[in-house]
Amino acid sequence: LKFPEQKRVFSMIPALHDAEFIRYGVMHRNTFLDSPRILNSDFSMKENANIFFAGQITGVEGYMESGASGLIAGINAVRRLNNIETITLPKETMIGALSRYIADESVKDFQPMGANIGILPPLEEKIRDKRERAAKHSACALDALEKVKVDFALA
């Protein structure tokens, strides 16, 4: 609500009718890139692969997601600087799935997204129990990360 409207609404409350408001509230705005048109899944720019973005501006939502994207972007910036192939984590991992989401050009109305099980690839078998399903997704992610360690000669 705009400031005059906030004053009007709050003043309708009998106990606040004569209150003096020192500061009114402001709405949080989330500014973000149209990442599918701008970024690759390694968090580098399509137009200039030497520039990396990370965090909320890329369209990942959440502290952990923003931090993880920063780690991947930072690792990839160093790898690019040293002429080493950049890493995109597997889609079975949450940050890998998010990095693919932000770079997916088929997404027409791009909106930020946080970590959620729905962006991971479906499991081969249906598992009804939520904890069991989460454990299976976790095992798949760890298996996929082992392959990354081999593919990119990481120890």
Question: Which role does the model predict for each range below?
Answer:
Residues 57, 76-155:
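Glycine- and aromatic-enriched mobile tails/lids
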Residues 6, 71-74, 142:
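Short, hydrophobic/amphipathic alpha-helical packing segments
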Residues 65-80:
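An active-site-proximal "capping" alpha-helix that borders the catalytic cofactor pocket
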Residues 2-60, 67-69, 87-104, 110-120:
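A glycine-rich dinucleotide-binding beta-alpha-beta segment and adjacent secondary-structure elements
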